[in-house]
């Protein structure tokens, strides 16, 4: 349950995470040979209305729209660090304006239980939710001390933006 800081050992769980890490390593390797300064933002979870159904929130919204009284949801007993899309954009602009050079976590620093996202999205639909949990919950939470030290302040609550 340790928060991941910029120096933490990274062990991606998905193919997507592995490709992000490969890109980061590639850029760091290439930039070592130059005087080009670069900001590598490690963006944790976020959502937006244009995301595909491969992402959690759009997939849940799509399931809730279906004409069933009971929704069976699998594998949601996990904790993730979601940042509001508005704060994500603000953080990127902030880092650009201060010309930040290096690697930095861009996240909320808050743990969100995935079941709570499903419950929030289901509030108006009022469907019965049946959760089928996997055995071991997982935690993925960013340490954002570095971002805060630079002066960035979050303005938006993730749950108010979904």
Segments and roles (model prediction):
Residues 1-40, 51-52:
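Catalytic helix-loop patch of NAD(P)-dependent Rossmann-fold dehydrogenases
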Residues 12-19, 49, 53-57, 81-85, ...:
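The catalytic Tyr-centered alpha-helix of NAD(P)H-dependent dehydrogenases
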Residues 42-45, 133:
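Residue-level recognition of beta-strand->loop/alpha-helix junctions
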Residues 64-162:
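C-terminal substrate-binding subdomain of Rossmann-fold SDR/epimerase-dehydratase oxidoreductases
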């Amino acid at each position: 349950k340790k928060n991941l800081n910029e120096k933490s050992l990274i062990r991606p769980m998905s193919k997507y995470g592995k490709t992000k890490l490969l890109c980061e390593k590639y850029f760091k390797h290439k930039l070592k040979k130059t005087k080009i300064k670069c900001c590598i933002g490690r963006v944790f979870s976020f959502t937006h209305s244009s995301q595909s159904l491969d992402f959690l929130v759009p997939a849940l919204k799509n399931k809730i729209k279906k004409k069933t009284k009971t929704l069976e949801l699998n594998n949601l007993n996990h904790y993730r660090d979601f940042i509001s899309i508005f704060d994500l954009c603000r953080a990127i602009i902030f880092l650009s304006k201060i010309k930040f050079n290096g690697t930095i976590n861009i996240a909320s620093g808050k743990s969100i239980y995935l079941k709570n996202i499903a419950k929030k999205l289901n509030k108006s639909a009022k469907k019965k939710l049946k959760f089928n949990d996997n055995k071991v919950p997982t935690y993925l939470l960013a340490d954002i001390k570095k971002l805060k030290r630079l002066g960035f302040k979050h303005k938006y609550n993730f749950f108010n933006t979904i």
